[in-house]
């Protein structure tokens, strides 16, 4: 006799088989999920990379939570566990309030000290316990739950009040590591072994340019950003009023996709994250492209850059993580996505984005490019603009391999020289034959 659980399971079988038939990659994913191991992670790690994955356990019978930290390098793996108390969540709340809710004219010495202490406290909880396990230069962070909204490169590695008088002098983790992120450690199996040759950029800017990125009007700073980027790398910009289908077609191009547009993590209706395709004052009246619509696409882009507000933010589901626009692009097949944790001031966003493409063009890994331009930004800015709000929002998630091939100028010069010598030899040979 069949019980109710078996009956329910059997009733789903036809739908599951239909999904497997319509989406054959699902079978590959199921198989990979079952067979994936620590050894595979180690094999896929590149030179000087370490993967650090976090897991916050549910409340134990005693009411306590624990933070598990898994560290995997090429040669070894380690696990560390520590209790989670209310202080940890208070520090995370302080970081969120001071970065996601940054207001320049409200900055005080008290807020500076509070944020500094919180960034150090989270470092002590998340990185310091396992730091002795890796001497690697590159960290791949796989965050869990609320840790997904933490900019790890802005964490402070030591607290010395006498030497840290402003944000410019803070010992950020950024100064020691190139940091990237992954939603799941299994995604490391999908990293590209080589760079694309010379990919072009397709940048999309809806409407005209008359307002800032922080308001729901047209985009002004984003246009200048795209113009500067296209002076560095080949590509095109599309700036006109378009409907959803126009954008969907662009998203399926085999190019680096740069989207400088408005987005919302949610709204008063509780909607899922979406892009705003029109330049209107009220986003609820705008033409929208939702995260679940992006999920259904099949992307061919080597990288998606979301130069928009809060593209890494969304609803948090326990056991699943944050459902964001960035995650939707990963699920649609993008190997890597650059996203933001909070709305960024126009001029600083432009500076970091343009610098990022400049470094990418040199053929270096994406995480190294983004980290390098952030360090350069901190070196060049006056103290107030070194507040993490201005530079720490942007993160690279997924594959970190170079997107542009590095030009070997010695090889090019050598090839030209050899070609010239061959040409000169045959020219001289033909001259003597005529004589």
Identify the meaning behind each predicted range.
Residues 54-55, 142-145, 177, 182-184, ...:
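Active-site-proximal beta-strand/loop segments in catalytic clefts of secreted hydrolases
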Residues 7, 195-197, 348-435:
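An often Trp-containing, charged/polar helix-loop segment at the C-terminal end
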Residues 183, 190, 255-351:
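Catalytic cores of nucleophile-dependent amide-cleaving enzymes
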Residues 147-156:
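A short acidic (Asp/Glu
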Residues 28, 33-38, 111-114, 216-271, ...:
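Functional beta-strand-loop-alpha-helix junction segments that form "active/interaction loops"
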Residues 19-54, 60:
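Coiled-coil termination/hinge junctions
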Residues 3, 7-14, 18, 25, ...:
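Peri-functional-center coupling elements
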Residues 52, 69, 139-141, 204, ...:
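Residue-level detector of buried hydrophobic side-chain packing
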């Amino acid at each position: 006799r069949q019980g109710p659980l078996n009956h329910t399971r059997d009733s789903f079988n036809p739908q599951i088989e239909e999904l497997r038939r319509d989406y054959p990659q699902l079978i590959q994913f199921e198989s990979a999920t079952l067979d994936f191991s620590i050894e595979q992670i180690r094999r896929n790690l590149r030179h000087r990379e370490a993967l650090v994955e976090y897991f916050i356990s549910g409340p134990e019978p005693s009411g306590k939570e624990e933070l598990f930290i898994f560290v995997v390098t090429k040669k070894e793996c380690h696990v560390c566990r520590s209790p989670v108390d209310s202080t940890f969540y208070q520090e995370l709340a302080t970081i969120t309030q001071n970065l996601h809710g940054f207001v320049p004219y409200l900055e005080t010495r008290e807020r500076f000290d509070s944020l500094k202490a919180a960034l150090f406290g989270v470092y002590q909880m998340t990185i310091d316990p396992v730091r002795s396990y890796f001497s690697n230069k590159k960290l791949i962070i796989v965050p869990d739950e609320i840790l997904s909204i933490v900019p790890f490169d802005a964490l402070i590695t030591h607290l010395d009040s006498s030497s840290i008088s402003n944000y410019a002098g803070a010992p950020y983790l950024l100064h020691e590591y190139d940091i990237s992120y992954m939603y799941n450690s299994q995604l490391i199996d999908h990293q590209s072994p080589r760079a694309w040759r010379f990919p072009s950029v397709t940048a999309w800017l809806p409407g005209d340019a008359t307002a800032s990125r922080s308001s729901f009007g047209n985009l002004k700073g984003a246009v200048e950003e795209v113009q500067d980027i296209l002076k560095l790398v080949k590509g095109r910009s599309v700036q006109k009023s378009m409907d959803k289908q126009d954008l969907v077609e662009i998203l399926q191009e085999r190019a680096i996709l740069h989207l400088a547009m408005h987005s919302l993590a949610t709204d008063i209706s509780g909607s899922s994250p979406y892009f705003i395709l029109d330049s209107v004052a009220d986003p609820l009246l705008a033409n929208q492209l939702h995260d679940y619509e992006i999920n259904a696409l099949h992307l061919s882009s080597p990288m998606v850059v979301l130069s928009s507000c809060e593209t890494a933010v969304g609803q948090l589901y326990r056991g699943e993580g944050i459902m964001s626009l960035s995650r939707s692009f990963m699920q649609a097949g993008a190997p890597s996505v650059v996203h933001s944790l909070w709305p960024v001031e126009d001029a600083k966003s432009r500076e970091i984005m343009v610098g990022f493409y400049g470094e990418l063009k040199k053929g270096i890994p994406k995480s190294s490019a983004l980290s390098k331009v952030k360090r350069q930004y901190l070196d060049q800015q006056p103290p107030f603009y070194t507040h993490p709000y201005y530079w720490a929002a942007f993160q690279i998630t997924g594959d970190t391999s170079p997107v542009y091939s590095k030009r070997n100028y010695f090889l090019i010069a050598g090839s030209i020289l050899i070609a010239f010598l061959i040409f000169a030899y045959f020219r001289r040979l033909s001259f003597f034959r005529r004589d």
